[in-house]
A protein has these predicted regions:
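Surface-exposed loop and turn segments in beta-propeller and other repeat-based domains
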Residues: 1, 27-46, 86-106, 141-171
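Short coil turn/linker residues within repeat-based beta-strand modules
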Residues: 21-24, 83-85, 137-139
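Beta-propeller blade signature
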Residues: 17-20, 73-84, 132
């Protein structure tokens, strides 16, 4: 693909390769790669979670986060543009600190996901650890990213579905945003 092109996603669960003139060069229907009980999680709403569509130039693939709605398991799927390889699925490890965030954590139940080369970097908004998964070696690592300034774990919200209480919980607790890795400095930010 040319350097003047960009992959764009929309709510139809399609992604489009668009060049600098606005010409659509390629369309990929991500729904084709979802199971019946899966949802696509491409989102940059910082109040909920951040998980972008990623184009891996070296592997000629698109990567995106999914969740199985019955098991609540998160996975990153890798779709190869030329369709010469089958879809690869990389299951994300649950939080080491709060293994089940499906209830009690307000809007903080989805992971933030970023990509650097062959690594998936992710974290959970309710705790400060950073997790990595190498898609070539399947090596998994986690780093306890402890803060000296705030609690490293969000308190569980016990108020049920009361909107005002959920908002209060969100405002009164820390929220751990997506983590990026800057390779030239070997630093997470």
């Amino acid at each position: 693909h040319s350097l003047d092109s960009v992959w764009v996603s929309d709510d139809s669960e399609h992604v489009f390769l668009v060049d600098s003139r606005g010409t659509v060069k390629n369309i990929v229907d991500l729904r084709e790669y979802l199971d019946d009980k899966e949802q696509l999680l491409i989102n940059t709403n910082y109040a909920i979670h951040t998980s972008r569509l990623y184009y891996n130039k070296n592997r000629q693939s698109l990567m995106f986060l999914t969740q199985n709605l019955s098991s609540k398991v998160f996975a990153v799927k890798e779709v190869f543009i030329n369709k010469e390889k089958d879809v690869a699925i990389y299951y994300l490890s649950p939080s080491n600190i709060i293994p089940d965030m499906s209830a009690g954590y307000s809007y903080m139940s989805f992971p933030n996901v970023n990509y650097v080369g062959e690594n998936i970097i992710y974290n959970y908004p309710a705790e400060s650890s950073i997790y990595t998964l190498n898609i070539v070696t399947n090596e998994r690592n986690s780093v306890m990213a402890e803060s000296n300034y705030t609690s490293n774990i969000v308190a569980e919200c016990t108020s049920g579905k009361d909107y005002a209480a959920l908002e209060r919980h969100r405002l009164e607790n820390p929220y751990f945003y997506d983590v990026m890795y800057i390779p030239q400095y070997k630093m997470y930010a």
